[in-house]
Amino acid sequence: WNVVESIPVHNNIKLRTKNFKKLINNYKDTIANIAANNINTICYNFMPIVDWTRTQLDFKLPTDGLALKFNYLQIIIFEMYILKLKNLEKRYSNKQIKNAEKLFKLMKTNDIKNLKLAVMGGLPASETKYSVSEFKEMLNAYKDLDNIDIKQNLREFIKEIMPVAEEN
């Protein structure tokens, strides 16, 4: 192996709450353990709640292969019609909301079910599945953070793990 991808960053680290310091130390140990096996590239992301967000887990390619797919309008649909979040106009333009509404009208029940599964169920190999109420509760933990706060928390995380990464 040359790369380890998607080592989860716990939400408490992203929020800098509760036991985040212990979790960062655990992450440092993970980095050191991976490096001890001559793997020097580790990929991760810092998204709230889920490790990856995709809106379709089985997008058919022209070659008949399957791929993961992300559709921004479907995320708006997910927030608007599945999570039933308020104040979407603070995150999305009127045009985006209107386009999402149009797309939603074209979706069948199975399309909505698959969208919900893709976003809340994670990748096919993932064992983590959330109910709508669990997902909303976890998302609510981020309600007081804006993009600047999240970026600052990411900077702090990187500042703490970089010495271990550079040493190994």
Task: List the predicted regions and their residue ranges.
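Active-site acidic/histidine proton-transfer and metal-coordination neighborhood
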Residues: 11-168
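A cross-domain feature marking catalytic cores of carbohydrate-active enzymes
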Residues: 3-6, 44-46
